[in-house]
Amino acid sequence: TTNFCLAATQTTSLAQCPTGYTFYTETMSVPKPGGGCCTITVEYCVKLATTIEVQVGKIHIPSECGLPVSPSLMDRIGKKIIYRMTVRGDIDGTITPCPWTTGFAIHFGYGSCYQWTGTIPGTSTNTYSPCGPTECVKYCALCIAPGDPDPCTGEPQVHFANCTYSGLPCPSTTGPCQINTCTSP
C-alpha cells in the first residue's frame, strides 16, 4: 500500500523545498462560481518515498475568476495533484477505478488558514499563502472515476472516499490570517 501525505508548511517559502523534495509550480483549470473555468497556479513540493508527501504552498488566482480560497478548492487541488502524479508516473502502480479503493490512500494535510499576500506585479492575479499554526488533516482512500470527468479538462477525476478528519478550522476571524480552508469533521 502506498500512502500519500500532503502537508503545508506554515511559515517557510516553498520556493526552497525541504531536503529530498522536488518543487512544482503547476497551472490547474478549476470551476469558478457561476459557471465556466478559471486557471490558477499552485506551488507545492513532493517527496517520493514509501509515503508520498506533498506540501501545498502558495495559490495564485486571477481576480476576474471570483474564486474564493476555501475547503472545496483545497480538496480539488489535492485531487488534481494526485492525478498529475499518476500522469507523470510518480506513483508506482495504478489507482483503482471507483468504487474500489484498495491499495492507495492519501494523508492530506495543509494549513487551515490562508491569507492574501499580494498581487503579482503587472497582473490582476492575487497570491494567497498558508499562515497561522493550525493544520487541517484528512486520511482518505483513493480511486479514479473515469465516469465523472473533470468539468474543466475532461480528464478522469480522483475521488477521495471513506475519509477520516482531524485538525481544526481556522481559529482567526480577524486580521489578515483568517481565510478558512478546513472543513471540520
Where are these regions (language model features)?
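Bacterial N-terminal signal peptides
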Residues: 1-3
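Extracellular Ser/Thr- and Pro-rich, acidic-biased low-complexity repeat/linker "stalks"
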Residues: 7-19, 51-52, 156, 174-175, ...
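Surface-exposed charge patches in extracellular/virion surface proteins
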Residues: 10, 26, 32, 47, ...
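Structured domain cores in non-transmembrane regions
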Residues: 48-104
